[in-house]
Design a protein with these regions (language model features):
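Extracellular adhesion/glycan-binding regions together with long Ser/Thr-
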Residues: 1-6, 62, 110-155
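Solvent-exposed beta-hairpin/edge-strand motifs
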Residues: 90-111
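Serine/threonine-enriched low-complexity regions used as flexible
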Residues: 3-24, 73, 85, 137-184
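Primarily secretory-pathway and cell-envelope proteins
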Residues: 4-50
């Protein structure tokens, strides 16, 4: 979770009830504390899985060596993204070669994300997208969709074990005076 440094102020009435606060409160007077945990999910395309609940992206699918396999990473952007110091999506495939030329980053049901708010770096084992949190306030609370293709290599496992293609999210989850924070 990403913890905010915003102080919670409140006043207690004579009867012990919460009378005033700078935070949202529910109908019983309890303060609703917001912790923003950015979620990341990664799926592979399977045209046989298209239905009203999804767009064909599922947990697993069958492909042949040489196929260009479509992947989709979804990332929920925290409400306080601009306060973070680090927000990085890393993809590390196994027996696949990411085609970074096919990477598209967009807001769910919306426009492409400005290329000025991230840096894409390809390495020998996948890619890294380093977002610039201070420039991302317009994406607060939105879901980003990162779509791309990866070629299934001839070194691929041809068993039911499959070939892993992991994505991770690295972010600062404690904003402190030094600006270093703690990675989550």
């Amino acid at each position: 979770y990403i913890i905010s440094e915003e102080p919670i102020t409140f006043t207690i009435g004579k009867e012990g009830e919460l009378t005033q606060t700078n935070m949202e409160k529910d109908s019983t007077g309890n303060i609703v504390v917001k912790n923003y945990r950015p979620d990341l999910d990664k799926k592979v395309y399977n045209d046989a899985a298209i239905d009203s609940d999804n767009n064909g992206y599922v947990e697993g699918s069958d492909y042949s060596v040489g196929d260009m396999v479509p992947y989709q990473i979804t990332v929920k952007i925290p409400q306080n993204i601009e306060k973070l110091k680090k927000f990085i999506v890393t993809d590390t495939p196994e027996n696949l070669e990411d085609d970074t030329a096919t990477i598209k980053i967009a807001v769910k049901d919306g426009d492409a994300v400005a290329e000025t708010v991230y840096t894409l770096t390809k390495d020998s084992n996948g890619f890294e997208i380093e977002f610039k949190p201070a420039q991302m306030s317009e994406y607060n609370g939105k879901t980003l969709i990162i779509s791309y293709k990866a070629k299934l290599l001839d070194t691929a496992k041809k068993t039911t074990e499959g070939n892993k293609n992991n994505a991770t999210l690295t972010y600062t989850n404690k904003i402190d005076e030094t600006g270093v924070g703690k990675e989550g």
